[in-house]
Amino acid sequence: MDVYLVGGAVRDKLLKLPVHERDWVVVGARAEDLLKQGFLQVGKDFPVFLHPSTREEYALARTERKSGKGHTSFDVFASPDVTLEDDLARRDLTINAIAQSEDGEIVDPYNGVQDIKARKLRHVSEAFTEDPLRVLRVARFAARFAHLDFTVAEETQQMLQEMSASQELSHLVPERVWREWEKSLLTQTPTVFLTLLRDIQALSQVLPGITADDSQLQRLQRTSAYSDSVTLRFASLFIEQETPESLKQFCRQLAIPNHYRDSALLARNHEDFITTPELPEKAQLAALLKQIDYWRRPEKLEQLLQLRQAEYSESKQQKSIAAQHKKLRSGAEKAAALNAGTLQQQGFTGKALGDALREQREQILAEALN
C-alpha cells in the first residue's frame, strides 16, 4: 500500500502558494485495509476515507467511465490493481495531476510541472470532455491564476469551445454552476471567469442574463480591486440590470442564495445614487434612508456607499467621494438616533409627528453634509 499527496496541494506547493487542505490517494489497498486502521468511510459513490487523527481525505486509487449525461453520470472502479497513473489520468488539468510520495518524490506522468513552469492550463486527456463541469472549473482556475500569468492552452481552449457547442453544459445543475461562479468571485481577477465563458460561447448557457460587456466587466474589476467582498462583487454586476423581475428570475434559475439576490436588487434599484458623483439633496437622502429601511437595516446604506466608493475608486474624485461618505455616515447615525418619543412629548401626533420626524432628519443630514 502506497500513499501519495495529490491534486491542489502539490500544485500549490510547486507554485509556492499556501496549502489550505491536503488530499491523498492510496494505491494497492482495499477499503477493508483502511477501515482496519481506523479510517472512517465517508464517500458513497466512491471510496473516500477520513484519517483517524488528521481528518484529511484519503481516496482509493480509482478510474471513472462516463455512463450518461451531465457531470454526475460516471461509473467508478476502485481496486488495488488501479495504478497511480490511472488515477491521475482521470483528473482535469495537468497541473492538478501531479502526485508526491511520502518521501517527497514528485510523480508527474502528464507533464504538469512543465505546464506550471509554462503557466499553462492544459487538459490531461480526451476524457476531459466527459464532464461538462470541467468547463467551469477551467474558467475558475483561469481566474484564480491569472495574476500568475496562467493562460488556457490553445488545444484546451478549442476543446472547451467544442464542449460548449455540444450543449452538454445544459445538463449542469444550477447549484454547481453557482458554486463554481461563487468561487471565481473570490479570486483576484473574477472577470477572467466571465470572459473565458464568453469567448467559448458558453456564457448564455450557464449564466443567461450576464453579458460580460465592457461596462459590466470594468465595474466588476473596479469593485474587485476595491473590495474582497463576494457580495459586493456580485451586486456590482447588476447595477444596470433592466428590471428587478429579470434579476429575480436569473437568481431563481441559478438557485443563488437570497442574500446575494437582495444585495443585487439594492444595487440595481439605486443605480443613480451609486453612479452619480454628487450626493442627492437632503430630502432625497432622507427618502433614500427610509426606502432602504436604514433605521432598522443600516448595513444597506453601507453596501451602497461601498459600491459607490468602488465606482469612483480609480478616479480623481475618490477622495472627495470618501469625504462625502464620512459625513453621510455621521449624519445618518445622528438621524437614526432621533427619538420619536421626544417629539410626542412635545405634542406631535399622527401625520404631524411623521412630518416633524422627517423634517428634523433632513435638517440633521443637511448640517452633516455642509
UniProtKB/Swiss-Prot annotation:
Asked whether the keyword Magnesium is assigned, the reply is yes
Q: Which reaction does it catalyse?
A: a tRNA precursor + 2 CTP + ATP = a tRNA with a 3' CCA end + 3 diphosphate; a tRNA with a 3' CCA end + 2 CTP + ATP = a tRNA with a 3' CCACCA end + 3 diphosphate
Which Gene Ontology MF annotations are present?
ATP binding; CCA tRNA nucleotidyltransferase activity; magnesium ion binding; tRNA binding
Which residues are involved in binding CTP? G8, R11, R91, R137, R140
Which annotated residues bind ATP? G8, R11, R91, R137, R140
Alphabetized InterPro entries for the sequence: CCA_bact (IPR012006), NT_sf (IPR043519), PolA_pol_head_dom (IPR002646), PolyA_RNA-bd (IPR032828), tRNA_CCA-adding_enzyme (IPR050124)
Instruction: Provide the binding site for Mg(2+).
Output: E21, D23
Q: What class of enzyme is it?
A: transferase
- The EC number of this protein is 2.7.7.72
Q: Mind listing the UniProt keywords for this protein, alphabetically?
A: ATP-binding, Magnesium, Metal-binding, Nucleotide-binding, Nucleotidyltransferase, RNA repair, RNA-binding, Transferase, tRNA processing
Keyword Transmembrane attached = no
GO aspect biological process, one term: tRNA 3'-terminal CCA addition
Q: Which cofactor does it need?
A: Mg(2+)
What this chain does, per the entry, is described as: Catalyzes the addition and repair of the essential 3'-terminal CCA sequence in tRNAs without using a nucleic acid template. Adds these three nucleotides in the order of C, C, and A to the tRNA nucleotide-73, using CTP and ATP as substrates and producing inorganic pyrophosphate. tRNA 3'-terminal CCA addition is required both for tRNA processing and repair. Also involved in tRNA surveillance by mediating tandem CCA addition to generate a CCACCA at the 3' terminus of unstable tRNAs. While stable tRNAs receive only 3'-terminal CCA, unstable tRNAs are marked with CCACCA and rapidly degraded.
Additional detail = A single active site specifically recognizes both ATP and CTP and is responsible for their addition.
Query: What family does the database annotate?
Result: Belongs to the tRNA nucleotidyltransferase/poly(A) polymerase family. Bacterial CCA-adding enzyme type 2 subfamily.
* Name of the molecule in the record: CCA-adding enzyme
Species for this entry? Idiomarina loihiensis (strain ATCC BAA-735 / DSM 15497 / L2-TR)
